[in-house]
Amino acid sequence: LLIQDIDDLVAGDVFIVQGQSNAAAVMYNGSSGAYQNDYLRVYSGGYTGSSSVLSDDNWYYAQGDGNENTGGNAGQWGLALAKMIKDQLNIPIAIFNGAHGGQPIEFFQRPSDYISSTDSNYGRLFYRLQKTGLKEKVRGLLWSQGEANAGATNNLSIEQYKTYFENLMMFWQQDYPNIEHYYLFQTRECNCGTNSSGRLLVKEAQRLLAVENNNVNIMPTTGMQVHSDYCHYPFVNGYEKFALRIFPQVMKDIYGLTLQESIYAPMITDISLSGNILEIQTDSESLVSNNSNTTALINSLNNDFVFSDSSISIVNFQLDSSKLILTLNQNPSNNTTLSFIGLSSNLEDNITNGSGIELVSFSNLCISGNCDGSSGQNSTDQDKKPAIVFVEDGSGNV
């Protein structure tokens, strides 16, 4: 007696993509269709409303060119990453993309009724994973968000943004207990309703989340080509590059496979000043200049490195293994801070590691004096928190 006939059944690994529009990663210019494959799946969709997610009880072959309200959408870089994992390991991949464009980090927090209600973004994502029985199967979570917290009306302090994200990690670990790693795409210089001071705060918060937590990696997006709206990305050299860059990290962190060297973005670990010589130490094995035109690269460095003392400029530079040494036009005044903002996507305009990955942006690090109000946090690995992060709520509970 045949009770039910089931075909096209797969079993594999699960990843979550979350954030705002650059996590939704809709098609702006160029299709991701070449990455579609029968072994990449999406349940329902990352719908922005309750009724839509409740009414769509379908599994789809993953596609990347739709939007939040398109059934089966994984986002362009979510789809590309899934295909890369599948091709490398012969493992089917399910992507749960919960992104919602234009939303601040507060929007993604877990409400008290998330188990019983799909009115919230958190509740809708939880519903999809609970309905499919895959809550315990999530291996990793990838996050691209920050622009909505970097504008004139919704700025968060560095500590506020960090706390919101660490709260999310705590909730995600409770609800999806087998998440092994988190991947942050650092917000880049952009329009998107942002301003310069807001971007500095968000980027520094994201950097410190990676510095201070063992299970968080960060990937800069300076090296991605920006769409004409100076906010989103085309597919080629944009969203596809999101996947290409993060794929080797996923392979190493989650699957234990090393596919290439220099897969992590260079992070500042120390900064020191002697007269007009500024030394920036990174955790990279070696730094690389990608431009034989020294004058052009110095011009780029002057655009990327922003001193609070605007009379300071860079007149020369030297690379010494993992160290970038800048010669300044004068000794900085007392309480001078330095930020690296990252403007150009061109390889030749950036100091990178051996794989062409540029520096992680940092904000308002003190190079002379005490610099009250600067982040001043150059934590090293030994200061990192354990992989499962516990954060107190307003009542002192964890």
Predicted regions span which residues?
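Cell-envelope and extracellular/periplasmic
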Residues: 1-373
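Short, solvent-exposed loop/linker segments at the N-terminal edge
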Residues: 270-274, 392-398
